[in-house]
Amino acid sequence: LTRSRGLGDVYKRQTLDWYQEALDAVSPENRLIPKPRWRIEHAQNILPEDQNRYSDMDIIASMQPSHAIGDLHFAHKRLGKDRLDNAYTWRNLIDLDVIVAGGSDAPVEIGDPRIEFKAAVSRTDLDGFYKDYWNLEQSVTREEALFMFTKWASYSVFEEDIVGTIEVGKLADLTIFSKDLMTIPEDEIMSSEVVMTIVGGKVIYER
């Protein structure tokens, strides 16, 4: 598992170039791991011509939705409006069949899964604020948001056989909320409370 961390679009391009060079140097049949699942952390500013490369090389994009709803207040000043279309392109990447692994970046961010889920499906901050330039069409469906933090996240670290979905033979790692996050209105997501948390089949929190 190789993870590279960086925020800028030029960094992403350089990293993709290095990954491509490494992949080209050893044929799949001669690799210790034929499909290595390399991952770029904070894949939040990607040049349009580089987005296809994630798909072509099977590179995993690791993103933290809470960064997007914080950045929306100042990104137009840091990036410039011409580059905002390249920011947090979750929808584009998923449509290209790229695995998008979600996270919180705690303790930089709060680490509340409700915040990450809401940010992914709405791209608005916790007060519902957004700007027209923030490309709401790049939000994801609720099923995709769920996959980002479960199924796709476990795949990104080679743990899909033990966690990431609820099924026989896997560790029972799950949180139960007081409301159905898949169906309630967006403005109710943050009011949903944790009823129970189970880790490895053991109840570690119960309201």
What does each model-found stretch correspond to?
Residues 1-7, 11:
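Single conserved hydrophobic/aromatic residue that forms the stacking wall/gate
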Residues 12-38, 42-43, 48-187, 192, ...:
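His/Asp/Glu-enriched, well-ordered alpha-helical/loop segment
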